């Protein structure tokens, strides 16, 4: 059964199309990563599903409630990027108490759940720290804790791994997987972190210019890649003529008397190594924009 149903969704900003999504559905326990370049409409999409922003046309139903109704906030919680929206000069604990009060709850009612979240996200050292002194990643944790205390059926996350270190990402991934698998929570997540998306997603949606242009499992869209890297190789610019003869189709740049070329194919990298003296070399992770460009243009 599809618990999120979107039909003929449209949103414009100043006459420009921000969203144009004819159809989208999601079901309990699904983790959907929404990826795309900046300005693709990712954040706008989850804000509309959560009821924080309203569409110009179309319908959004979440567990039977329209996103325009007050009931939507009982089912959906949105965690914004960088943990914004808290009282800077209250502690983390004081902010938690305040938001519990807004939701007509109290610490005594959620004592066990709160302790469990503190443990899973290693949050105990920060409970009495002012929010103004928390790092971006720790604010993200606070945002997630407050959202989950409301026991949402749908959790919308906007770039949730920004500011998180490797250990925090693993804690975060484990928690989201537990929510989806044991409680059936739907997680809709915008992200530029392709490796995090690979680890936890049941489905990937690629957005471009306000449209969902491709969706499927991670392997269906990105193949079996485990890393996306390119090689930056430098040789002496005195070897320019020889390089152009051997590799006429490769472009390059000249920097500080070095000829710099970028390649992604390891065999091509080895061919360059075998034919020239290498004076500079590094592996560089590709950006999400570069990865998506390759995926979209391979279709």
Describe the residue ranges of each PLM region:
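C-terminal coupling/interaction segments
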Residues: 263-299
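Conserved ABC ATPase signature
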Residues: 130-134
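Conserved ABC transporter NBD signature motif
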Residues: 58-74
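ABC transporter nucleotide-binding domain
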Residues: 175-260
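Conserved ABC ATPase "signature" region
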Residues: 97, 101, 109-126
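Catalytic Walker B motif of ABC-type/P-loop ATPase nucleotide-binding domains
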Residues: 155-159
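Helix-to-loop junction immediately C-terminal to a conserved catalytic motif
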Residues: 50
């Amino acid at each position: 059964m599809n618990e999120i149903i979107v039909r003929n969704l449209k949103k414009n900003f100043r006459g420009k199309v921000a969203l144009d999504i004819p159809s989208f559905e999601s079901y309990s326990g699904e983790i959907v990563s929404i990826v795309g370049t900046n300005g693709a409409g990712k954040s706008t999409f989850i804000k509309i599903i959560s009821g924080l922003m309203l569409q110009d046309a179309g319908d959004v139903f979440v567990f039977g409630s329209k996103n325009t109704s007050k009931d939507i906030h009982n089912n959906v919680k949105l965690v914004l990027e960088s943990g914004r929206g808290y009282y800077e000069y209250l502690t983390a604990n004081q902010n938690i108490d305040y938001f519990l009060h807004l939701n007509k709850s109290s610490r005594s009612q959620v004592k066990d759940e709160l302790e469990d979240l503190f443990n899973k996200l290693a949050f105990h050292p920060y409970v009495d720290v002012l929010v103004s002194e928390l790092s971006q990643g720790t604010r993200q944790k606070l945002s997630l804790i407050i959202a989950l205390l409301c026991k949402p059926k749908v959790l919308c996350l906007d770039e949730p791994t920004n500011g998180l270190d490797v250990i925090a990402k693993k804690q975060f991934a484990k928690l989201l997987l537990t929510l989806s698998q044991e409680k059936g929570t739907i997680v809709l997540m915008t992200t530029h972190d392709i490796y995090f998306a690979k680890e936890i997603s049941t489905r990937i949606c690629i957005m471009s210019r306000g449209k969902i242009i491709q969706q499927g499992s991670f392997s269906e869209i990105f193949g079996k890649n485990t890393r996306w890297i390119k090689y930056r190789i430098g040789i002496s610019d005195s070897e320019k003529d020889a390089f152009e003869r051997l590799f006429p189709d490769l472009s390059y740049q000249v920097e500080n008397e070095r000829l710099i070329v970028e390649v992604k194919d390891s065999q091509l990298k080895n061919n360059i190594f075998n034919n020239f003296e290498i004076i500079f070399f590094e592996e560089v992770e590709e950006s999400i924009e570069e990865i998506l460009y390759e995926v979209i243009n391979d279709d």
